[in-house]
Each structure stands twice: as C-alpha cells, then as structure tokens.
Design a protein with these regions (language model features):
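A short, Trp-centered hydrophobic/proline-enriched beta-strand micro-motif
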Residues: 157-165
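A structural signal for short hydrophobic beta-strand segments in well-ordered beta-sheet cores
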Residues: 181-183
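N-terminal glycine-rich flavin-associated loop
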Residues: 122-145, 171
Length: 444
C-alpha cells in the first residue's frame, strides 16, 4: 500500500476532540477570572497553604470540616454552576451537558495536574466540574414514582444523601452485610424495620437522608436480596456513633447505627432485592475518574520535581544533572505517559458501551487504570518529597497532602487487592471475554 493509502486507512487517532480542548481552555479562563480571586480573598489561602489541615478541621467538633471551609467550597460551586460548569457531566434532560467518560477523565486529570486549589480540592472531591454519581445513579434506577417524589429535591440540592454500604465487619465482601430490613407495619401503615451498622458513611454531617443497603432476602454471599433504602437522617434509631479520624483530616466518615429504624414501604430506590447493582452501577465511572485524578496529581508531582531539580544547585551544580535525581523521575514519567493512554482509551470505550457490557468486557481495564494510578501518585508524591528535601517534607509544599489524600484510594473505591483480583480473573479466564475460550479449551 502507498503512504497515501495507509493514511486513508488509518483509524487510530490520539488527538482529543477539538470541543474538549476548547472546553479545557474555557475552564482555565474561568479559574483565572473567578476562582483564583475568590481563593485570594479573606485569607482563603489558609485552606491551601501550610495551614490547610488546621484551617479545614474543627478538632473540637469530632474532626469535622469547619463551616468556613465548607462555605467557601459552596461559593466556588455556585460560581461554577452559574457559569455552566458544575453540571457538565449531568444528562441534558437534568440540566447538564452530557459530558462523556472521556471528557470527564481528561478534565479530572487536567484539574488535578494544577495542584492544590479551590478549583479542584483533592480531599473533599469538590470540583468546579462536579462528579456526583448519585445524580446518574438516580436517573438510571429510580422508578417514575421515585423520580416524581425525589427528583426535584435531589437536583435542587435540598436532598443530600449519605452513603451506607460498608460495615464494621464487611467491606470488600459487601454481600455478607449484616444490616437487615424486614417488612413491618406501624400503626396500620406498611413499612420496613432496619437494624444494623454502617461504616465510613460519607457526608452524614450534612445529609438529609442516607442510602442504607440492607439484606431483605437470601443468604450471606448472595448478590441478590439486598435493597437500597432511602432513610431520613433524623429518623428515630439513626445514630452517629463516632466520626473516624483519618490520615488526612477533616473527616466526614462516621460509623452509624440503625436501631429499629422504621420507614414507609416505598422508601427505597430501584427495585427490592436488586439494590446492590445500584450501589455498584457506577463503580466503573468512579474508578476511571479517580484514576484520572490520581494521574493528574502524579504528573503535578513529577513536573514540580523537575522544575525544582533544574533550579536547585547544591555545590554549584543543578540537581537535575545527577542521575540519582533523573532516573526515578524518568520511571515515573514513563508510567504517567503509559497510564494516560490506557485511561483515555478505556474511558473512550466506556462511552460506547452499556454498563453491563463494560462489566463483561473491559472491567479489568478500569481496574488496571485505578489501582495503578493510585499506587503511582503515592510513589510520585513520595519522590517529590525526596527531591525537594526538607521543604518537600514540610507542609509548605503540597506533596505530603497529596500523599495522605491519595493513599486512601488504594483502599477505597475497591481496594488495590480487589482490583488486582479482578484483573487476574479476566487474565486467567475466570471471568470476562476469555472465560468461554478457556472453557472450550478445557472441554477439548
């Protein structure tokens, strides 16, 4: 074939869509015009410089976020919403722009690569381009009656939901949860009685409701028989037992008990006994976006280290001339480049598949992206601390904050071990596309 023919036949294109490139520039302009001035006012820099952990954390109130910190985040979200950015990923029929998986992955990387700032706070997962999986979860699984009942409140921010899936004794093995819900009438009204405990119940300090996953039928280990209930946070029997203090503070993750909590019969989302699928429905979306954020933060650490190594001149010679400095950063940059391509390819493929097809065919790729990105950013932050020396270890640089925050994602969003197990299942044909192939070979 001639060169021209090869060009005509080519189908591989690594260029980002032009409208996405333009949107990144639009976001950058918005940050410069609106977000940075807000961050610079009223000593708001205290939430991002060396004072950040204390400025954000109310140590005398269970380690919860200070009200001033949450108020600042709310102001930034309002500016973003007014400018049309906050709901970018929402479906158009829900007031959004229908942002694709590829676009969201690129945006998350782009913002995280800028470092710490009001435009995209790592710790709270606040961003001027909102993620909010509950919106898409609700759209996908809510019945017409549920949508009519809760849709306007949820979209308008009047309904804020905590998330209760993990339990003190059950994390990765969610199908063994001990929380139960049984049908029980109260004063002649049919309903449910919930008993159990949940752990790391995100957002309970501001929640109006909490999503409680409880077993309604079946036995331990069954994926079916679990229902997602929507419980008013002020229901009798709902009690925040303690807020769990973590490596990176403040916290909004309590242990919550549910003691004979009664709710009306229609207080659930999705279908009875099919709630676990709701809880896991957007796990791929969350994991690919989290991978992109970790990649962006890793790239920031590498870029800052390279810049510093060129500027710092001990003994009259730039650090960057030393192979002991060069080689670890070369390794990290190589991983960033490879991971970026896999994340974008996987996100692009996700845009062309229904959820069930993603699970059947490329769930392992999502796990590859997620576990490796979260490991990579920890390595990059640690290396940045080393390159920057004493200042790198101090809180006057952001690397310790990046490390402390992203270290959690090697446990949450599916632990590193669970992700690797998923990849292994696909690789060895215990799940995924190779399963039938290996089964046929075994039969032969």
């Amino acid at each position: 074939l001639s060169g021209k023919s090869l060009q005509e036949e080519a189908t591989m294109d690594f260029d980002l869509p032009s409208d996405l490139v333009a949107y990144l520039a639009e976001l950058d302009a918005f940050i410069e015009a609106k977000i940075k001035p807000l961050q610079a006012r009223d000593d708001n820099e205290r939430f991002f410089d060396h004072r950040r952990e204390h400025a954000r954390t109310d140590w005398d109130n269970n380690g919860l976020p200070r009200k001033a910190w949450e108020a600042l985040l709310a102001k930034a979200r309002k500016l973003a919403d007014d400018a049309g950015h906050l709901r970018y990923a929402w479906p158009p029929e829900m007031g959004g722009k229908g942002g694709t998986q590829l676009a969201m992955a690129v945006i998350r990387e782009h913002l995280a690569a800028k470092g710490l700032g009001l435009f995209n706070d790592l710790q709270t997962e606040h961003s001027i381009v909102g993620n909010n999986p509950f919106i898409l979860m609700f759209k996908e699984f809510a019945t017409n009656a549920q949508y009519e009942r809760d849709g306007e409140k949820l979209l308008g921010g009047k309904m804020r939901t905590g998330f209760g899936l993990t339990e003190p004794n059950h994390g990765s093995d969610a199908t063994f949860m001990e929380t139960t819900a049984v049908r029980q009438d109260k004063d002649g009204e049919p309903g449910w009685l919930i008993r159990g405990e949940k752990m790391w119940t995100t957002g309970m300090h501001v929640a109006t409701h909490v999503m409680v996953f409880a077993r309604t039928s079946g036995k331990d280990g069954d994926a079916t028989g679990i229902t997602c209930f929507i419980v008013p946070a002020d229901s009798p029997g709902v009690k925040i037992e303690e807020y769990m203090w973590t490596f990176n503070m403040p916290t909004d993750h309590p242990r919550v008990s549910f003691t004979d909590v009664w709710i009306p019969k229609d207080s659930y989302w999705g279908q009875i006994d099919r709630g676990l699928g709701l809880g896991q429905s957007f796990v791929h979306q969350n994991r690919i976006r989290q991978a992109a954020s970790s990649l962006g933060a890793a790239q920031f650490c590498v870029d800052e280290s390279v810049k510093y190594a060129r500027e710092r001149k001990p003994f009259g010679k730039a650090l960057s001339e030393n192979q002991a400095i060069q080689w670890p950063l070369v390794e990290l940059q190589t991983q960033c480049e490879m991971l970026r391509l896999l994340i974008r390819k996987t996100a692009w493929q996700m845009d062309r598949m229904e959820h069930k097809e993603i699970e059947r065919t490329i769930s392992d790729k999502v796990s590859m992206c997620n576990y490796w990105a979260n490991r990579l950013v920890c390595e990059a932050a640690d290396r940045a601390m080393q390159v920057h020396g004493g200042m790198g270890y101090s809180r006057h640089k952001p690397f310790e904050h990046i490390y402390r925050h992203h270290r959690r994602y090697r446990i949450t969003e599916g632990s590193e071990e669970i992700q690797i197990r998923k990849v292994a299942a696909y690789l060895f044909g215990y799940a995924g596309p190779k399963r039938a192939q290996f089964k046929d070979q075994a039969g032969a």
